Amino acid sequence: MNKRDAFFALASRPLRSTQVMVEGEVFTLRELSEADASEMEVAMQDKSGKFDYARHRMLLVTYSLVDDEGKRIVDNWEQLKAFPRTIIGRLYEACLDLSKYDEKEIRDLAKKSGEAEG
């Protein structure tokens, strides 16, 4: 297989997933596709175009949390506002690791949106 074919074959690789125990219940998180990540990064901005850290946490969980068939469990990130921070935080940390977001990338997203100073 040539390099071009080998590269494009990677697109058919299944997205990785992991299971996380929260309050005695096991939940499945799936890594983001590039399309999901791009869509989510646009949705992270508030009405004025500023990066919203709280929205980022909830969106990452929304896009990653799936049922046994691989379908998203949460329809709208705002549904997560009622959850305890410890639960969203536990899921969020696992999502960061799974989709390879790190604090530097999150700060860069904030800078690009104009919120953070640099």
Regions found by a protein language model. Give the residues of each.
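Short, surface-exposed, charged amphipathic helix/loop patches that serve as local interaction elements
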Residues: 14-15, 22-118
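Extended acidic low-complexity intrinsically disordered regions
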Residues: 1-14
